[in-house]
Amino acid sequence: MTDGQGNTVYFSECVIIFTSNLGIYTRAADGGRQQNVTPDMPYPEVQNRVRSAIEEHFKLELGRPEILNRIGENIVVFDFIRPEAARKILRSQVDRIFRDLSAERRIEITISERAYSVLLEHALGNLENGGRGIGNIVGALLIDPLSRFLFDNGIFSDARLEITEIDAQAAPPCLECRRS
């Protein structure tokens, strides 16, 4: 493939990965969309339903079965994020934030079980938004309030804090910290 500036890229030894929600929803009789798969379905059923919907989309809706033929069997259907995976994603994101603050600002942070349970409750509350949804929750309930707390209290480096409480209902969400 050659771009508009004459640069040529050869795809003979490339792997192209794209993600899509194709197959998650189907068209309802009224023209709206209806959910084709749900998080409570076992993965084999999710996989079969999504593959069938993708095939139908390329063959019937687009009228381009040759595109699907070029992709072949190289479609990987990802499962919904299940609660155990969501717990791991949340823990990983929180740990990374605390590790980065420690490395970059020498700010050591711990979080109480009570505060962490608020994050976990919200992360598990809507798994349909996937990993990005968990990241958005971490941003809204932890990163943004923690940033405001640090700035408002003039804490820019060399501190030890414990997050004791997260108030997700406040507008904007806020947290309570104490020096440890």
Q: What are these language model-derived features?
A:
Residues 1-180:
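AAA+ P-loop NTPase nucleotide-binding core of proteostasis motors
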